[in-house]
Structures are given as C-alpha cells and as structure tokens.
Amino acid sequence: MPGWSCLVTGAGGFLGQRIIHLLVQEKDLEEVRLLDKVFRPETREEFFKLQTKTKVTVLEGDILDAQCLRRACQGISVVIHTAAAIDVWGIIPRQTIIDINVKGTLNLLEACVQASVPAFIYTSSIDVAGPNSYKEIVLNGHEEQQHESTWSDPYPYSKMMAEKAVLAANGSFLKNGGTLHTCALRPMYIYGEKSSILSGIMIRAIKNNGILKVTGKFSTVNPVYVSNAAWAHILAARGLQDPKKSPNIQGQFYYISDDTPHQSYDDLNNTLSKKWGLRPDSSWRPPVALLYWLGFLLELVNFLLRPVYNYQPPFTRYLVTISNTVFTFSYKKAQRDLGYEPLVGWEEARENTSEWIGSLVEQHKGTLNTKAQ
C-alpha cells in the first residue's frame, strides 16, 4: 500500500488522538487528515509536532456538513470514523445523538462513494451488543454469537444503526468504478490517560474527600486500554488494504479487548487510583433490582415533566444495566483476521493511567474537601 493517506474523524477525541499518534508511525503513509468540529489549542500544537515524513492536515468541520465531508475525503485511501456523540447519561438531546451518530455516518459513507475512498473503518461500541438485562451473563463472548442491543436509548440505538449502515455499505460501487470495503470495531469500555469519563470520576472523588462513587460493583467487564483500541484501528487499516487479508475483513465486525483483568468498573477505578489515596464508598448500596426500578420511576418523572421541564434523571434502567452486568468478550477473531495483539500490557497500562490520575490529584488537590476534625 505505497503512498496511502488516511482521514480520521473525531481526531481531537480521546481515542482519535491515540490513533493519530500511531498512524504517523506507519510506513508509506503520506498524509493523515484530522477532522473534528473544533480542536483545542493544545491539541493542535501537539498534532503540529507530529509533522515528520507524514503530512498532518488539521480540518475543522461538522460531521453533518456533507460538502465539508466530501472535501475532506478527496484523495483519501482510508477513512477511520471515530466521531460520535457519546452519552449514556441522558444529557444530550436524543435527536442530536441520532443525527451525529447515524446521519453523520451516512453522510461520510456517501462522501466516500463520491470521492472514491476504498476503505472505511467504523468505531462502533460494545453497547451495540447489549447487555439487555442486568441478569444477562456473557463470558468471553464472540462474534458468532447473536448479541444485539434492544434498548431504545439514543446512544446504543444510534451506534447500532450506524454500524449496520457501515457493514451494509460494504461492496458499494465507488464513483471511479472501484469498490468500498468496510468493517466495524467494537471496543470494550476504553480507559487510559485523557479519558474524559475517568477524569470526571476522579475529579468528583477528589472533591468528595477522596471517596469514589460506587456505581458498578456488581459488574464483570474486560475494559480495553486506549492504545490497544487505537492499535486495532491501525491493523484494520492495513488489513483492508492488503489483498490477502481484506476478503476476510470486509463487512465484518470485531470485538476489541486486551489482557486487562476481568473486573467490575468500581474495582478498575479503585485499582487505578488507590495509589493516590482515593477509595471506594463503603456505605450501603441498594441491590441492583431496586436501582433498576428506581431508574424506571425516574424515567417516568422525566416523561411526565418533559412538556414543561427538562428533568435529567441521575440514572436510568439502561445505565443501571450496563454498569452491573457480567459482560466480557474475546478478541480472538481480531487476532485471527487483523493480526491483533495488545500493544500495551496490563501492568504498563495500569501504571500509565495511574500516573495520569496522580497528575489530576495534584492539579485539583486544592479543591479537596476535608472533614472537620
């Protein structure tokens, strides 16, 4: 694949930035284009420093702007589509999430057809597979099993619809007579340095006398470190351009995990932060069944008040379910088809993330609430 080029949407995001750092190390990559709605000045500066043999072009534009996408796709070999509205808390309006995640993806697929981009990699989510019940148990699930979310909540619904559109587009004819080849990656919960979710959890704990809020003590999951999730995208980009590997990858989806130990979300947060004196809340926690039905009542209040007031429930049945379910998946198919092996081991991933959390503690320790003696 001599002289290839790549467009990454959502390039200013948590995963997107890590993909860029790996992409610029790729042999024969002539240009990487970075597209996001807006880039922070420090992110722009960081990307500017990556200019070496690979041309780095920073573009600001809206995923809903079809003309912008067509311009961004001109002369591109591979599109990696990570841009998404990520919200499992019910903060972003439903239609906004669906527009960005579904309509935006359809716009980008059409731009690829018009600009004759032959390869498209979609960053999907484990949420498209479920879980659909907190009683559901999936251990080392795989792609041959039928796991599909039945939730109507906008995030899992929109990601599932977008993934289906991407996989259905495989084999589409391009304007130049070529063929579009697509695949989708379903990362587990992604953790690591610069995670906005982890940052929020840790900063709230710092402001709460170092107490971590307990939200997922009944879960068993296998999170994936951000560099490993990014690495899978690089391998997918290579694979779709490899005449020998591509036929096995086209139209396929892959679960992306690594060797992070299977554990609860709360245990992960505790493991990553205990070095800095943060600790889990030891107070009584209602059983999951009670939380689930409380979530239903809160959703009912939201529905009844919607005509006059935008009430945001503190949690929903969906959030209770995904936070308290046994739901782990194997990466063997990605290993077989993409040649995927985790780039970073658990020990290094844990240390990197923990040190970053330490910097957050140092940065925010002035806001640490202390109990009266």
UniProtKB/Swiss-Prot annotation:
Q: What Gene Ontology cellular component terms go with this record?
A: endoplasmic reticulum; endoplasmic reticulum membrane; mitochondrial membrane
Subcellular localization, per the record? Answer: Endoplasmic reticulum membrane; Mitochondrion membrane
Cited function:
3-beta-HSD is a bifunctional enzyme, that catalyzes the oxidative conversion of Delta(5)-ene-3-beta-hydroxy steroid, and the oxidative conversion of ketosteroids. The 3-beta-HSD enzymatic system plays a crucial role in the biosynthesis of all classes of hormonal steroids.
Q: Give expression by tissue.
A: High levels in adrenal gland, kidney and male liver. Low levels in female liver.
Q: Which family does it belong to?
A: Belongs to the 3-beta-HSD family.
State the gene name recorded for this protein: HSD3B2
Enumerate the transmembrane spans.
Answer: 288-308
In short, the EC number is 1.1.1.145, 5.3.3.1
Which UniProt keywords are listed? Endoplasmic reticulum, Isomerase, Lipid metabolism, Membrane, Mitochondrion, Multifunctional enzyme, NAD, Oxidoreductase, Steroidogenesis, Transmembrane, Transmembrane helix
Species:
Mesocricetus auratus (Golden hamster)
Q: In which pathway does it act?
A: Lipid metabolism; steroid biosynthesis
Protein name according to UniProt: 3 beta-hydroxysteroid dehydrogenase/Delta 5-->4-isomerase type 2
Q: What are the BP-aspect GO terms?
A: androgen biosynthetic process; steroid biosynthetic process
Q: For binding NAD(+), which residues are annotated in this chain's numbering?
A: K159
Q: Which reaction does it catalyse?
A: a 3beta-hydroxy-Delta(5)-steroid + NAD(+) = a 3-oxo-Delta(5)-steroid + NADH + H(+); a 3-oxo-Delta(5)-steroid = a 3-oxo-Delta(4)-steroid; pregnenolone + NAD(+) = pregn-5-ene-3,20-dione + NADH + H(+); pregn-5-ene-3,20-dione = progesterone
> What is annotated as the active site?
Y155
Membrane topology for this entry? Single-pass membrane protein
One GO MF annotation is: 3-beta-hydroxy-Delta5-steroid dehydrogenase (NAD+) activity
Q: Which InterPro entries match?
A: 3Beta_OHSteriod_DH/Estase, Lipid_A_modif_metabolic_enz, NAD(P)-bd_dom_sf
